[in-house]
């Protein structure tokens, strides 16, 4: 059980960077010699994020142990340089499911099951099972959300039971700038802190998020009306690069203040290195989730951490109505393309057209999960002349099911948590570009999230092993399934069934993205 706790709450509105702040502070303390762990609490009733729409909630992040999580766990892994697990995320759905299950099993011995104490006790018990000496707890949403109240009550009770001196509460809030009057408005933050105090939680530190640096008088007002000392009201304006945040926090010495208050010994060593200059490469993600960049968060960050500027999301549906010439005119402007994972029929034909363009014009392209499957379909249609080739996901009656549902998935009825998930052993074939990318490693463990597979056995005319002759897709990685394909005589035509984006860390992006960036810059043989 952890001995010290930092609890991060949010105020005014969501999406203001609690996850980045929590990950940054945890990284600083980790580098300072503290055995730190981190936990994300999501108040939604979903058991996990696996069935959520990426347009609404952002990407689903997959851990090594096969848990489908909120994208904040991706921030934790990238910033801390660690691999988290399902234990690092608690949802309201998990808590209520567990409590109801216990009641049905008679574990409460006939008690009237209530929010307090039964639900709060379940939350506290899960927090107590976490590893590490110091636990950073990020509570999702904002203070005042009805679904989050039970979690705030649980951490309040925990602080009372264990000892308030072992807890440090950080409230991350937002102060808007009203351009019509040229002033910052602190009233929403004041009211947010008042709500928190009514619950029984008095913040020790307030992080004031703003679009631009705030004036000292506004910070004084936040301090005065919140009852938090001025030196603990800290402004964090928007950064052009989120990887600047740990440096900024470290310079503000917040970690020293917290360590002193929690009686933690630190050595104040901080080793933080991230890309500060970027190649001006235009890399396109041919996708279908356009509502937010968060839908492809880990891919975007992997490209960024590999030293290239932020990729652009291309609407796959727009490509569907274009001719080959129009697509060429449009995509010629890009240095490389990525076909990401996804589900459903929408935009599929546009992605296939983009793959055809990249194959014929030797444009560097990376297909991830569904992207690899579509590479096989495109090759079957346009090279193998198998008219109507498809995946049974999109056409159950296709005459050429190049992509089919895995046998183990055909009897599965529920959608949540039932795919082939998490780290799976993958054998890399010698003599392939993929083998060069992995620096000769023969076995790797990569994270998966899929129900469908490329059926190479049924269509041997389309695939070959490394070193064999003929214009076919080379199978460059295997498990019980086809894990990767590539194309000879092409600078970078690589499809992978797994998701390398989930394993990129600050200072250590996944090598597949580093090589894609090299190919985009024409440096594949450097």
UniProtKB/Swiss-Prot annotation:
CDD domains: CTPS_N, GATase1_CTP_Synthase. Residues 282-526 form the Glutamine amidotransferase type-1 domain. It is an enzyme of class 6 (ligase). One of its GO terms (biological process) is pyrimidine nucleobase biosynthetic process. One of its GO terms (cellular component) is cytosol. CTP binds at residues 14, 145-147, 185-190, 221. It holds the Pfam family CTP_synth_N. It catalyses: UTP + L-glutamine + ATP + H2O = CTP + L-glutamate + ADP + phosphate + 2 H(+); L-glutamine + H2O = L-glutamate + NH4(+); UTP + NH4(+) + ATP = CTP + ADP + phosphate + 2 H(+). GO terms for molecular function: ATP binding; CTP synthase activity; glutaminase activity; identical protein binding; metal ion binding. Its EC number is 6.3.4.2. Mg(2+) binds at residues 72, 138. Keywords: ATP-binding, Glutamine amidotransferase, Ligase, Magnesium, Metal-binding, Nucleotide-binding, Pyrimidine biosynthesis. Signal peptide: none annotated. The active site is at residues 369, 499, 501. Belongs to the CTP synthase family. CTPSs have evolved a hybrid strategy for distinguishing between UTP and CTP. The overlapping regions of the product feedback inhibitory and substrate sites recognize a common feature in both compounds, the triphosphate moiety. To differentiate isosteric substrate and product pyrimidine rings, an additional pocket far from the expected kinase/ligase catalytic site, specifically recognizes the cytosine and ribose portions of the product inhibitor. Homotetramer. Catalyzes the ATP-dependent amination of UTP to CTP with either L-glutamine or ammonia as the source of nitrogen. Regulates intracellular CTP levels through interactions with the four ribonucleotide triphosphates. This is CTP synthase.
């Amino acid at each position: 059980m952890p001995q010290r706790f930092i609890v991060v709450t949010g105020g005014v509105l969501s999406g203001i960077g609690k996850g980045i702040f929590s990950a940054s502070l945890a990284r600083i303390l980790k580098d300072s010699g503290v055995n730190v762990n981190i936990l994300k609490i999501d108040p939604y009733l979903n058991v996990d994020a696996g069935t959520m729409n990426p347009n609404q909630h952002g990407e689903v992040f997959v851990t090594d142990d096969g848990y489908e999580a909120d994208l904040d766990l991706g921030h934790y892994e990238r910033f801390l340089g660690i691999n988290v697990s399902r234990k690092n995320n608690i949802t309201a759905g998990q808590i209520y499911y567990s409590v109801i299950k216990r009641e049905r099993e008679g574990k409460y011995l006939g008690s009237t099951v209530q929010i307090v104490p039964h639900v709060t006790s379940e939350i506290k018990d899960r927090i107590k099972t976490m590893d590490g000496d110091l636990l950073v707890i990020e509570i999702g949403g904002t203070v005042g959300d009805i679904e989050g109240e039970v979690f705030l009550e649980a951490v309040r009770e925990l602080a009372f039971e264990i000892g308030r001196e072992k807890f440090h509460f950080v409230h991350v809030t937002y102060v808007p700038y009203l351009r019509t009057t040229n002033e910052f408005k602190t009233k929403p933050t004041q009211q947010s802190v008042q709500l928190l105090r009514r619950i029984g939680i008095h913040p020790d530190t307030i992080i004031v998020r703003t679009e631009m640096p705030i004036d000292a008088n506004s910070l004084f007002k936040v301090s005065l009306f919140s009852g938090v000392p001025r030196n603990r009201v800290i402004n964090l304006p928007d950064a052009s690069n989120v990887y600047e945040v740990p440096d900024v926090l470290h310079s503000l010495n917040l970690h020293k203040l917290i360590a002193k208050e929690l009686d933690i010994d630190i050595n104040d060593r901080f080793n933080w290195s991230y890309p500060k200059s970027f190649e001006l490469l235009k890399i396109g993600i041919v996708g279908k989730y356009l509502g937010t960049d968060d839908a492809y968060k880990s891919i975007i960050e992997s490209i960024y951490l590999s030293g290239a500027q932020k990729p652009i999301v291309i609407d796959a549906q727009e490509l569907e109505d274009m001719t080959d010439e129009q697509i060429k005119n449009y995509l010629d402007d890009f240095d490389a393309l990525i076909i990401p994972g996804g589900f459903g029929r929408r935009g599929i034909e546009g992605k296939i057209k983009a793959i055809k363009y990249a194959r014929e014009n030797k444009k560097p392209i990376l297909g991830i999960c569904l992207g690899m499957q579509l590479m096989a379909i495109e090759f079957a249609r346009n090279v193998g002349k198998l008219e109507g080739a498809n995946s049974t996901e999109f056409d159950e009656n296709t005459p050429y099911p190049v992509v089919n549902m895995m046998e183990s998935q055909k009897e599965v009825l529920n959608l949540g948590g039932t795919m082939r998930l998490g780290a799976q052993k993958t054998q890399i074939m010698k003599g392939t570009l993929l083998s060069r990318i992995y620096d000769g490693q023969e076995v790797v463990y990569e994270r998966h999230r899929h129900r469908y597979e490329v059926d190479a056995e049924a269509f041997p005319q389309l695939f070959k092993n490394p070193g064999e002759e003929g214009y076919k897709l080379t199978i460059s990685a295997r498990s019980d399934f086809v894990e990767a394909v590539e194309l000879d005589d092409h600078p970078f035509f690589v499809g992978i069934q797994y998701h390398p984006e989930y394993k990129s860390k600050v200072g250590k992006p996944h090598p597949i993205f580093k090589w894609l960036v090299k190919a985009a810059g024409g440096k594949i043989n450097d």
